[in-house]
Amino acid sequence: MSSRLEREAARRRTFAIISHPDAGKTTLTEKLLLFGGAIQMAGSVKARKAARHATSDWMAMERERGISVTTSVMQFPYRDRVVNLLDTPGHQDFSEDTYRVLTAVDSALVVIDAAKGVEAQTRKLMDVCRMRATPVMTFVNKMDREALHPLDVMADIEQHLQIECAPMTWPIGMGSSFKGTYDLLHKQLHLFSATHGGRIQSGIVIHGADDPQLDEYLGDQAEQLRMDLALLEEAGTPFDEERYLKGELTPVFFGSAINNFGVREMLDMFVEFAPGPQPRPAATRVVEPGEEAFTGVVFKIQANMDKAHRDRMAFLRICSGTFTRGMRLKHHRTGKDVTVANATIFMAQDRTGVEEAFPGDIIGIPNHGTIKIGDTFTESKEVLKFVGIPNFAPEHFRRVRLKNPLKAKQLQKGLEQLAEEGAVQLFRPLVNNDYILGAVGVLQFDVIVARLADEYGVDAVYEGVSTHTARWVYCEDKKIFADFQDYHRGELAVDAEGALAYLAPNPWRLESAMERYPKVEFRTTREIS
């Protein structure tokens, strides 16, 4: 391993932001870019109005290009680290993509609205983090508004996200009486000031809770803070780096993203403690980030919504080695060698051609329909297939009906290609010729119907279907499996890759099937082959 590769890989921090819509994720993302991008590049913080104007111009330009990849991946420098931030879309475009983003990162940041606590979408995404033992940090946002008590917020996180909380900062008051936060690690007081654009005044060093300066700055609230600190000292969970890296414990920060408050402490701790690029399991072995030979895996495909250009962008996570412009790579699923001349890297404020990139970086490769999610690219001829990019059991189902029967072939082609892209899952029942679509979010069905019309000239509609949930089924005992398939034939289907799935009409039917056939596995995820 070259010392440069080792050095560059060690600088990378690749993470995703997880939150429920309206918890302030977009605002926090902008503030992270402000601390990491604008401050580094401009040397000063622009007025917020001007910054907002610049951002909106930038987005308009993106719209003209017809593809909004900038919201998906952003890279920015911070304190000699290179941070790759992956956005998980909000509920409007919630899809399996959101889950798969979490397979491309080494850690995650959960944003929680202090007034609402943990919400449904956050739970689903945390399930994926838990499955992969992903280290998670938590930012409790909107402390400048009326909120739940911080102990209640942490209890909510521990109960619903099944992870222990270690507070790193502690809020002093909330809403109109919000005075700031106390940094438990460095024993510093950060005073909140909604004036000056809410920028942090330098931390005031306090020598423990008995320091008389505490009363000077906080007045009546000093005593409450002392009581809180005594309680945390006695009953709180201290930060443990090892447990954080195992995904067992989350450091918790309190603040107000819109006022830039509490963001810097979290970002400082993030670049210090979050893991760099991690080893990646392949079917035959584990690939270490420091290996000289380049390897990468595609975790997302974004369609170009510009109808004039059918191109798609494949998002590839670099797992090892150095990527350089124009290098020849082996595309393992097709067995072909390809030259990657015009890959893209996504900087905080623009997209640029990649000259070189390192483990942990995300690059975009133009794709004319030949690249699929889960595809592996390598520099060497070694046969390699990265694992761990799953399909998730859909939660919503619709049947697709064709208005013009003569377009059956185009419908099949369109649905197969869209399923390949990961936009939706396609199931073909064993007992009829229906096309059943399964999706994580209902909006995906509208997207599919619109794209069938636009891109494939197919006029189709979708309608309800009596499927409640899907499970991929597997059994080592062939006799039991054959009996199961005979008994449930009317509820079985194959997906786009030929895997057998049980489409349960209701929860009771699924429960009954699982009780009747205990040796059959009913899986909620399936590895993409």
From Swiss-Prot:
GO terms for molecular function: GTP binding; GTPase activity; translation release factor activity, codon nonspecific; translation release factor activity, codon specific. Residues 10-278 form the tr-type G domain. It is found in: Cytoplasm. Keywords: Cytoplasm, GTP-binding, Nucleotide-binding, Protein biosynthesis. The keyword Transcription does not apply. InterPro entries: EF-G-like_DII, EFG_III/V, G_TR_CS, P-loop_NTPase, PrfC, RF3_C, RF3_dom_3_sf, RF3_GTP-bd. Gene3D superfamilies: P-loop containing nucleotide triphosphate hydrolases, Peptide chain release factor 3, domain III, Translation factors. GO terms for cellular component: cytosol. It holds the Pfam family EF-G_D2. GTP binds at residues 19-26, 87-91, 141-144. GO terms for biological process: regulation of translational termination. Coiled coil: none annotated. Increases the formation of ribosomal termination complexes and stimulates activities of RF-1 and RF-2. It binds guanine nucleotides and has strong preference for UGA stop codons. It may interact directly with the ribosome. The stimulation of RF-1 and RF-2 is significantly reduced by GTP and GDP, but not by GMP. NCBIfam families: prfC, PRK00741.1, small_GTP. Belongs to the TRAFAC class translation factor GTPase superfamily. Classic translation factor GTPase family. PrfC subfamily. This is Peptide chain release factor 3. The lineage of its organism: Bacteria, Pseudomonadati, Thermodesulfobacteriota, Desulfovibrionia, Desulfovibrionales. The gene is prfC.
